[in-house]
Amino acid sequence: KIVVPALALLATAVSFSSHASVTPDRTRLVFNESDKSISVTLRNNDPTLPYLAQSWIEDAKGNKISSPLAVLPPVQRIDAMMNGQVKVQGLPDINKLPADRESVFYFNVREIPPKSNKPNTLQIALQTRIKLFWRPKALENTSMKSPWQHKVTLIRNGQDFTVNNPTPYYVIISNASAKKGGNPPAGFTPLMM
């Protein structure tokens, strides 16, 4: 009976103490079709050690891709407390993406720590994954007279809720409850639609 709580406590302590040294400057990217590329600043927050930052793009299913988007440079060294920059570049195949709705990809950064000179050291390479939305020209300039967000509906049916997103934009629902400030229902997981 003591083993399970001890393991749970250990897992909690480890999760609180682990955080990435190399982090992107935002939590999501929007790549407008009218832009040739977008830049992302990567920050090495470690006060003493340089890190390698490896970056790549994945499709909506989590498969690593090399087109229609690419990251340059794919690997770079970032010194302690310094910034690096990567460019997400559109390639010719980008014209094959739907022109009437957003497409979702994932931008990934893996930090690679320097080799330790201490014996018997476990090193962990942490990875950050953020959403990257490609937005076609038809969706770039939305009218504030009729915001697209007002078209997203929430319908209550007893204890259940149905969300309808008829728009060409992705909506992320990170939390839900039956009343303001309430707890989410058991088993609720964030979703993107």
Spell out what each predicted region is.
Residues 46-63, 167-183:
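Short acidic, flexible loop segments centered on an aromatic residue
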Residues 12-17:
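N-terminal signal peptide c-region/cleavage motif recognized by signal peptidases
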Residues 93-139:
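Terminal connector regions
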Residues 38-44, 88, 105-110, 160-165:
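Buried hydrophobic-core signal for structured, non-transmembrane domains
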Residues 35-37, 50, 83, 102-104, ...:
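Extracytoplasmic
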Residues 63-97, 181-193:
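Intrinsically disordered, low-complexity Pro/Gly/Ser/Thr-rich segments with frequent PxxP/GP/PP motifs
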Residues 1-7:
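Bacterial N-terminal signal peptides that target proteins for export
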Residues 20-43, 142-156:
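Beta-sheet-dominated interaction scaffolds and their linkers
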